Design a protein with these regions (language model features):
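As written
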Residues: 96-106
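Conserved phosphotransfer microenvironments
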Residues: 57-72
Length: 125
C-alpha cells in the first residue's frame, strides 16, 4: 500500500464521534492523529509530525470557542495548515467571525459522504 493521501488531526472531545471520524477517514486512505482537547492537539502541532488538515470541533470541553482558538494557534505554528471545523450547534455570524479565513464548517450530525466531501474540498483549497 502507498503513502497516505493526507495526514488529518482530528480534535473531538466526544470519544465515539472522534473514533467514527478516525475510522471513516482512514478508510479513504488518509492517516489520522487524534486528540481529545486543545492541549493534546497543540502537542501534535508543535511536533515534527506532518499534518495537512486540522479537523476540529468548535466546542471543546465546554470551551465555547476552543476549536476556533486552537485553529488560530495552529495556523500560527503551521501557516500552510488547512482547517475544517465541525459543530452540532448553530453557527452564527458572530461565530463565523472567529473562524480562520478560508476554512469550512461541517454541521453535526454528518454522514460519511458529507465528511468526505468536506475533506476533499479542504484539501483542494
Amino acid at each position: 500500500m502507498g503513502a497516505p493521501m493526507a495526514v488529518i488531526l482530528i480534535v473531538e472531545d466526544e470519544v465515539f464521534t472522534r473514533e467514527v471520524a478516525e475510522m471513516t477517514i482512514q478508510d479513504w486512505g488518509h492517516q489520522t492523529l487524534s486528540a481529545c482537547d486543545v492541549e493534546e492537539a497543540l502537542s501534535f502541532l508543535r511536533s515534527a509530525q506532518p499534518i495537512d488538515v486540522l479537523f476540529t470541533d468548535i466546542y471543546l470541553r465546554k470551551l465555547v470557542t476552543g476549536g476556533c482558538d486552537l485553529a488560530r494557534q495552529a495556523i500560527a505554528l503551521r501557516p500552510e495548515l488547512r482547517v475544517l471545523y465541525t459543530t452540532g450547534n448553530l453557527v452564527t455570524d458572530k461565530m463565523k467571525a472567529l473562524f480562520v479565513e478560508g476554512t469550512r464548517c461541517l454541521r453535526k450530525p454528518y454522514t460519511p459522504h458529507e465528511l468526505q466531501d468536506s475533506v476533499v474540498a479542504v484539501l483542494a483549497a
